[in-house]
Each structure stands twice: as structure tokens, then as C-alpha cells.
UniProtKB/Swiss-Prot annotation:
Family, similarity comment: Belongs to the actin family.
Main location per the UniProt record: cytoplasm
Name of the featured protein: Actin-related protein T2
Keywords from the named record: Cytoplasm, Cytoskeleton
One Pfam short name: Actin
Gene that specifies this protein: Actrt2
Record SUPFAM superfamilies: Actin-like ATPase domain
Gene3D superfamilies on file: 3.30.420.40, Actin, Chain A, domain 4
InterPro entries the record matches: Actin, Actin/actin-like_CS, ATPase_NBD
One GO cellular component term noted in the UniProt record for this chain: cytoskeleton
Subcellular location: Cytoplasm, Cytoskeleton
Length: 377
């Protein structure tokens, strides 16, 4: 029987991404745990020694043991593609990272814009039937990111590991007809950076693995305000120093701005479609004319792949060229935007008014999986 007092407990929040899953409890200023969205299975059976071999590994432990494992990434381009693996990921977060019993806490799970109906319903089904949570809610990642900046109307420009999207939001509701998506994001930038560095002919004293390329990307990559001018600069002016794990120092140049450039020119990767600025402009102009000026004046960046130095300035410059003359444009780049969706979820689930939003186990029992379509939008 449902106990309404359970809604007074801090809720569990899972913000699921292609690369990382952020988990924590409502009312806190940031996620307690950030775990790689990966599950690894042993490639070979261990010889019998009396000790039982683990059947799978999750997150950083899987990456650490990756040579002996077959790695599965259950979230691809923002969407869940393997429910068995996502169940293992969530179970790991509940039991080992947060140390909570799912049957004792309300749970909010974030979802990408335009999440397919079957994925929404499967998430609810798994939470209620597999984890037996007492209450559940599914919330749009972009809307939550906007909430974290204390706004309810604006355009969210979100770029994570697997997908980049522009989402117009009016009074707390996303406008799905105007959402733009680009399947170029952090992992594509890392892969391109790796190819560019290897093609440069530079000898690396250690293997250029994904973790190393990710670190170079996060520490040194930037978005050029004028890519053509950057190309004409002297080599010594663009070189930046990077210290490798073995202590060797290397110097990297043009590749540091060439890799993130694909966010603005995805055709460089053979992906047809508009870049970031054109996506933002398209999303806004698909909205009612009465709110377009408001949206241009409240653009909020979200996600780890918007953290590149210079990205906000480049986006502003290109949007000023695309927007009608005289339309004021404001871009907010919160320093904690890597976690902004999670923070937004922490804020809203802490509000006393949110209690009426939860789908309870009793609701699920009465209405079934379709309840998520009526209650979460």
C-alpha cells in the first residue's frame, strides 16, 4: 500500500547520458556520483578457483578492466538501446553508489527531448516493476537545464557526449515541433581529435587512447571565433603544452580548434545538416512570432560539450548575423552546465508543489504504463 510520507524523503535523481550518468539526491547542490554509462562483461571464463567471478562490471571499474571485458554502452545518441544493461547501471547506482533502497525513495529520471513513447513507457515499467519504486517522474533534460538557470522560458542549447540539440521552452514546456537535433557531439569531437593528432605525424611516447584524447579535449580544445583567421596565425601562436601521463610534454596546435569546429560545421564529418547557430535560429523561428524575441534573449548553454572556451562568443556572433536586425541576443553559459540538468531536477523535486506531480505506484497499478504519457510532459 502506498505511503504518502515517502514523498517527504529526498528523491533519487538519475540524469542519463550517452557518456555519463549523474546520480544523487534531491536538495543537494550537485550529483553525488558521476559514472560512465558502460557495462562490461568478461571475455573469458576464469578458471575455477573457488572464488566466484563477477558476471559484469559497471562504470569506471569496467573501463579500468576493459582489456579483459566486452564493453556495452546502453545509451546511444541519448536514447536507451539496451534495457538489460541500463537496469544493471541503475541497480549499481542505487545499491553501490547511493546506498539506497529504491523501494523507499521517489525517483526522477531525466529524458532527452523527443524521447520515443516506447522508451518513456519502458522506463516507467522498469522503475515500478523491477525496482518497485513508490513514486516516479520523467522529466525533459532541456527543461530542467533551463530551471537550473532560474528561467521557465528560453532556448536551451545542449551538447553532451552523443547528441546536440536546441530546445525552445515556453513557461516550462518544451515545444517539440521546433526541437533541432544533431548527432555530432562530444564523442565525435574526441574521435576527430584523435584522427587529427595521429595524422599530424607527431610521435606519441604512449598510446593515444580515448581517455587521453578526452583529457586533451577537455583541457585544451577551444572554439575559434574566426576559424579562417586562426588558420593563418603563426604555428607558435597556437601551440599549447600538454603533459602526458608518463611525464613527457607535447605541443599541440591547430587540431585543438579544428576538432570542436564540427559543432558549427558538421559537414566536415560528412553529416548533412545545420551547425549549432543555424540550429538555434531554426528552432526559434519555428516558434510563434510573439515569443521569438524572448527566446533570442534567453539562450542557455547546457552539457559538457558546450564547455569549450569561445563557444558562447562564436554562437553569439553567428546568431547576430542570422537574427533580425536589432533583436537583442543573450547567451547564458553557467559554469556548472555540465551538471545543469541534474541541478534543475534537484531544485524542482525539492519544491513542496512537486509532490502532486509524482506518479505513484497506485497510479501505475490503476492506469498502467500509459500514465507516463498523461502525467509527464
Amino acid at each position: 500500500m502506498f505511503n504518502p510520507l515517502v514523498l517527504d524523503s529526498p528523491s533519487v535523481i538519475f540524469d542519463n547520458g550517452s557518456g555519463l550518468c549523474k546520480a544523487g539526491l534531491s536538495g543537494e547542490i550537485g550529483p553525488r556520483h558521476v559514472t560512465s554509462s558502460v557495462v562490461g562483461y568478461p571475455k573469458f571464463k576464469a578458471p575455477p578457483t573457488g572464488a566466484s567471478q563477477k558476471k559484469y562490471f559497471v562504470g569506471e571499474e569496467a573501463l579500468y578492466k576493459q582489456e579483459a571485458l566486452s564493453l556495452h554502452y546502453p545509451i546511444d545518441r541519448g536514447l536507451v538501446t539496451s534495457w538489460d544493461d541500463v537496469e544493471k547501471l541503475w541497480r549499481h547506482l542505487f545499491e553501490w553508489e547511493l546506498g539506497v533502497k529504491p523501494c523507499e525513495r521517489p525517483v526522477l529520471v531525466t529524458e532527452p527531448s523527443l524521447n520515443p513513447r516506447e522508451n518513456r513507457e519502458k522506463t516507467a515499467e522498469m522503475m515500478f516493476e523491477t525496482f518497485e519504486v513508490p513514486a516516479f517522474y520523467l522529466s525533459d533534460q532541456a527543461v530542467l537545464a533551463l530551471y537550473s538557470s532560474a528561467c521557465v522560458t528560453g532556448l536551451v542549447v545542449d551538447s553532451g557526449d552523443g547528441v546536440t540539440c536546441t530546445v525552445p521552452i515556453y513557461e516550462g514546456y518544451s515545444l517539440p515541433h521546433a526541437v533541432s537535433k544533431l548527432y555530432v557531439a562530444g564523442k565525435d569531437i574526441t574521435e576527430l581529435l584523435t584522427r587529427l593528432l595521429l595524422a599530424s605525424g607527431r610521435a606519441f611516447p604512449c598510446p593515444l587512447e580515448k581517455a587521453l584524447a578526452d583529457d586533451i579535449k577537455e583541457k585544451l580544445c577551444y572554439v575559434a571565433l574566426e576559424p579562417e583567421e586562426e588558420l593563418s596565425r603563426r604555428a607558435e601562436d597556437v601551440l599549447r603544452e600538454y603533459k602526458l601521463p608518463d611525464g613527457n610534454v607535447i605541443y599541440i596546435g591547430d587540431q585543438l580548434y579544428q576538432a570542436p569546429e564540427v559543432l558549427f560545421s558538421p559537414d566536415q564529418l560528412g553529416t548533412h545538416g545545420p551547425g549549432l547557430a543555424q540550429m538555434a535560429s531554426n528552432s526559434i523561428t519555428k516558434c510563434d512570432a510573439d515569443i521569438q524575441k524572448t527566446l533570442f534573449g534567453e539562450i542557455v548553454l547546457s552539457g559538457g560539450s558546450t564547455l569549450f572556451q569561445g563557444l558562447d562568443d562564436r554562437l553569439l556572433k553567428e546568431l547576430e548575423q542570422l537574427a533580425s536586425k536589432g533583436v537583442p541576443i543573450k547567451i547564458t553559459a553557467p559554469p556548472d552546465r555540465w551538471f545543469s540538468t541534474w541541478i534543475g531536477a534537484s531544485i524542482v523535486t525539492s519544491l513542496s508543489s512537486f509532490k502532486q506531480m509524482w506518479i505513484t505506484a497506485a497510479d501505475f497499478k490503476e492506469f498502467g504504463v500509459s500514465v507516463v504519457q498523461r502525467r509527464c510532459f
